[in-house]
């Protein structure tokens, strides 16, 4: 998405800033010791930016915002955006972080509802090839299993880098395609407890993508149940394409006019008149809940990045179209039954 180059340019500027200023801390070279670009308020917590080396060639970028309350005792939350291939810095700077880009992108404003009010939050850019995460050999081909393994290694490396957090309560969180990543990751954590103890307390996923067949099918039913699709189109899909019952209909195998009708229903959520994340919320002419106008602002900072052109090509908030071939979506159910007793608190 072109509009995300706004944020990309900001993070490149942030990277340059980090290169020159972050390492001034004598206690931790990853600590951010100077004021962030565009920040318009005073911080009352420590924050960090650095890398977690998970193999000889792979380095995952992370940012940590310490709890404002009691970082020694408050929970540690790991956050992952979805995609697959979306940078978790989107979560940091546009959703739940302590500093958010304002509407026109001119400054970073304080978020009164930041998750780090009562928890230390770790934003990990995963898999390698997303954001500032990289592989020295250029091999960032991945799939769901590789991503889960890499995320587990990253979390273990985090606790080795920050052993003071090892006894804190831990929560694994994310959104969207994290519905695939995180149950797999949590399963690895549970199975690895005997070798690497993590004080896991919970898993939370917003708007999760859990199972392709179920998610796609439920979208059709949701659209009809909320009056998004007209009766004639619905009856056509139901009777002519799904043998009278949409529940259990294998939508992916539909062809011809049936496939076109299903696509038409899905497109009803992206026609610019409906907010796909909350149909009761007005989003004007925007096709989704967020306004991306602010992302254009950082294109005006390009003159400060002339010597970082190479990095600019590598840094990505989303895996772009030319890179999708590197990410294999397994698209099955990711839920491991062994997680049930863990999530039930047993």
Residues of each region from the PLM?
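Terminal and linker regions of secretory-pathway proteins
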Residues: 2-346
